[in-house]
Amino acid sequence: MALVRFSAPIVPKCFETGAQVLSDSCGGLLSVIPFAHSDLEGIMAHRRIGQEALRLDARAGRQTSLDELHALLDWAPADRALASVYGAAKGEKAWPPLAMFKALLLATWYDLSDVMLAEALEDRASFRRFCGFARDEATPERTAFVRFRRQLVEVGLDQSLFAAIARGLEKKGAIVRKGTLIDATVIGSASKGDRDAAWAKHKSRAPVHGYKAHIAAHKDTGLIRAVETTAANEADVTIAPSIIPDAPGEVYGDKAYDALSVEVAIKAKGGTSKLMRKGHRWLPAERLEAHNRPLRPIRSRIEKIFGTWKRSYHFRSMRWIGLAKAKLQVHLAAIAYNVKRFWRLQRA
């Protein structure tokens, strides 16, 4: 631990540089301990948790995949995005927002309820290290995650967090603008009484009451570049223009996107349409198949993302009621997918 001596008690400037200062009873000798970025206004309302956990457990045994993943990513952009999450005005201090955000990622990857997540943080050393908790330190209870999610929804941070992580990946060269895949999937509602959700029909499956996640992903890496959440009955072509990123390259999509409005949006953003076509009376079947055949295997790559969500994360239905909470859950799934996908790409 670095030691710094001051001649007299002062207001530490380390609040501007990301460090916590502890003074002795005389105010002369102070120790400086790094901590995650947070604005000065809310810093006293949040707990400070022990980052020494990483050093303690590194000597105890081999690193886990979570340790590798944590070290690979730059968490500073997410920490800055979380600066507006306020702490408790009275009573017990709130948990650090970045630690809580990391805990929600763990809950997404391992399909954990709030109760299961709280228990896992108590028992699993790798989970503690990932979130920044020391070995013998107290961890959040179930209700803390409920309050934190409520704050994320109130402040509207789901999109900001997704963008912050995406910027971090882009700086590491993970997102290359050479092609874009677009698609959507229906996710069931938490309750048939959810008034923000809607029924969606499918020609080969039973109707589903829920929401629809619309995404755009990079053609080669499979990293998600944009995401939007709507009621399940929203048409894909309606949302497509808003999820197509700037300079998208070649844009691949299934027949649901065969519409003039999507073609115009692709061209306006500097891209080239590689959309599959619907059948028409004036279009011979052989010409239609010749157009669609080479596009089909490329377009279908995006379905691996939805497969991961639904099979690995068990994200077949929402946990919470309401569109705002559905958007948060979809963004968390997209962030969790991107982080794990980036880690696997680096290991390949």
Where are these regions (language model features)?
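Basic, short loop/linker segments at the boundary and entry of helix-turn-helix/winged-helix-like folds
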Residues: 62-110, 144
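Structural motif
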Residues: 90-98, 205, 321-329
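Helix-centered, glycine/charged polyanion-binding patches within enzymatic domains
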Residues: 249-250, 255-331
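Charged, often Cys/His-bearing segments associated with DNA-binding zinc-finger transcription factors
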Residues: 2, 6, 10-76, 80, ...
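Polybasic low-complexity intrinsically disordered regions
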Residues: 92, 119-122, 131-133, 140-269, ...
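Short, well-ordered loop/turn and helix-capping segments at boundaries between secondary-structure elements
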Residues: 109, 123, 154, 249, ...
